[in-house]
Regions:
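N-terminal, cleavable Sec-dependent signal peptides of secreted/periplasmic/extracellular proteins
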Residues: 1-202
């Protein structure tokens, strides 16, 4: 019998060729950027929210910096965070680093004209809205509308100028849920909008 007569060949593990070398797959990094109010405006300070995910869509820890600027940042929770940035050029890039691997991403292009709108909590039941427009748009009366669950909760006006204009909005009586602030002119043109989650104290 051939199989019984054939000699047994023993190969030591160290002598065996490695036919399938172990390779480490580079982690795919995705990053999305969301200027507060929807737009980056040249020479106007803006907060930029971001989210960093892997190839499965899950948020991951990361650090980053704006190329050519002394601006660094890191994720806070589930791959999300924010940084403050004043664009001086139309196009800017951000470097995101995850586990020692760095990728470069484009920020949304900065626009030459428009408004930057920021929304911050003020006490336990109010928010303060700040609006800062470019020179050619100053001196206009703009509308500010607050909706929650698709219903109008508040409406008022704000006067735009070179310095940020402010308006305080009470959230008393506003139900818990996703709210949205809209900035628009007398013709109904929407310049900026911003969502936030309101947690009712009732």
């Amino acid at each position: 019998n051939y199989y019984e007569a054939s000699p047994v060949i023993t190969i030591k593990r160290s002598d065996a060729p490695e036919f399938r070398p172990k390779t480490e797959k580079l982690r795919k990094i995705n990053a999305s950027f969301y200027p507060e109010g929807g737009h980056l405006i040249l020479d106007k300070e803006c907060r930029v929210a971001f989210k960093v995910t892997d190839d499965t869509g899950f948020g991951i820890d990361a650090t980053g910096r704006v190329e050519g600027k002394d601006i660094t940042f890191s994720t806070v929770h589930d791959g999300m965070g924010w940084f403050t940035f004043t664009p001086k050029e139309k196009s800017s890039k951000v470097q995101i680093t995850v586990d020692g691997t760095t990728r470069s991403f484009d920020l949304p292009q900065a626009e030459p004209f428009g408004y930057v709108m920021t929304v911050d909590p003020l006490g336990s039941d109010s928010i303060i809205v700040r609006v800062n427009g470019t020179q050619g748009l100053s001196g206009k009366t703009l509308g500010l509308g607050l909706t929650c669950r698709g219903e109008l909760m508040d409406f008022g006006t704000i006067e735009s100028g070179q310095a940020p204009a402010e308006r305080i909005i009470s959230l008393r009586g506003v139900p818990e849920g996703v709210c949205r602030i809209y900035l628009f002119d007398k013709n109904g043109i929407n310049y900026s909008s911003r969502s936030f989650y309101h947690r009712s104290k009732v």
